[in-house]
UniProtKB/Swiss-Prot annotation:
The protein's enzyme class: transferase
Protein's membrane topology: Multi-pass membrane protein
TM region positions: 24-44, 45-65, 98-118, 122-142, 164-184, 187-207
Disulfide bond positions: none
The protein's name in its UniProt record: Adenosylcobinamide-GDP ribazoletransferase
This protein's record includes keyword Cell wall biogenesis/degradation: no
Swiss-Prot/TrEMBL catalytic activity: alpha-ribazole + adenosylcob(III)inamide-GDP = adenosylcob(III)alamin + GMP + H(+); alpha-ribazole 5'-phosphate + adenosylcob(III)inamide-GDP = adenosylcob(III)alamin 5'-phosphate + GMP + H(+)
Described purpose of this protein according to its UniProt entry: Joins adenosylcobinamide-GDP and alpha-ribazole to generate adenosylcobalamin (Ado-cobalamin). Also synthesizes adenosylcobalamin 5'-phosphate from adenosylcobinamide-GDP and alpha-ribazole 5'-phosphate.
Domain of life: Archaea
Similarity comment: Belongs to the CobS family.
Length: 255
């Protein structure tokens, strides 16, 4: 229970007093479940009024319940990507001011998620919200897998915690989104696979660019992963990919 309390205390704004427990990473999927349930509920409740408003409230709720920590991470990563001199990267991450790169990156990531979700029908939207949250948390955590700390801080602490059960954590964060995807349409299953592929490419590019990983970069990759998945999910849904139910129905009717 200490790990669960620690996970909710660290990753959400829920007022739970808890010290940083070494097992909190194992409970991150439960945080994702809470976030996804909240966002999906708001989405369903408001969808009949306005798809755009439902999407805005849903996406914003996740950012807010996470304490806007990842908003800061996306902005810092955006600013850092604009710096050519590696010796100044730490200075940029520790600077509280947000530059043009940070503003653009934050707007891009947020609007990509918002526009993609607001263009979906209700069924696809619900599944996409849920899977996007699990994928976001999974990608953020898997970013720590065999990564070198960029410098000492929260990121290096989490990398050390992840290394203690590296293989188990990686299996956990890969399997959960895949299992959830199998319960949905074929288009969403393909979207999850493509999102993971793009995640691997992005992680490699980030490590090549910065030489390591810190908390902000892990948070940025998680949020970018959410937006990319929602975009892919929309594209796949509109490309008339048959659902698993449709495929089974056609097979049964042909017998």
């Amino acid at each position: 229970m200490k790990g669960l309390r620690s996970a909710f205390s660290f990753f959400t704004i829920i007022p739970i007093k808890s010290e940083l427990d070494e097992h909190l990473i194992a409970y991150v999927p439960l945080v994702a479940l809470f976030d996804a349930a909240l966002a999906a509920s708001l989405y369903v409740a408001i969808y009949g009024i306005s798809k755009l408003l439902a999407s805005f409230i849903s996406v914003s709720a996740i950012y807010i319940v996470n304490g806007l920590n990842h908003v800061d991470a996306v902005a810092d990563a955006g600013d850092a990507m604009m710096i050519r001199n590696r010796s100044r990267i730490r200075e940029v991450f520790e600077d509280h001011d947000v530059g043009a790169g940070g503003v653009f990156t934050l707007i891009f990531v947020y609007l990509l998620a918002l526009i993609s979700l607001s263009s979906m029908d209700l069924y696809i939207g619900i599944f996409s919200i849920i899977l996007a949250e699990f994928l976001s948390k999974s990608m953020m955590m898997i970013t720590l897998h065999r990564s070198r700390p960029l410098f000492q801080g929260i990121g290096s602490l989490f990398i050390d915690l992840y290394r203690k059960h590296d293989s188990l954590y990686t299996v956990e964060f890969v399997v959960i989104p895949i299992v959830l995807a199998l319960l949905s349409r074929a288009s969403i299953m393909i979207s999850v696979a493509l999102a993971f592929l793009i995640f691997i490419i992005v992680k490699m590019a980030v490590i090549r660019r910065f030489g390591g990983i810190n908390g902000d970069l892990a948070g940025f990759i998680g949020e970018l992963g959410r937006s990319i998945f929602l975009m892919i999910s929309l594209i796949m849904a509109q490309s008339s990919v048959l659902s698993t139910y449709d495929i089974l129905s056609k097979i049964m009717s042909s017998l």
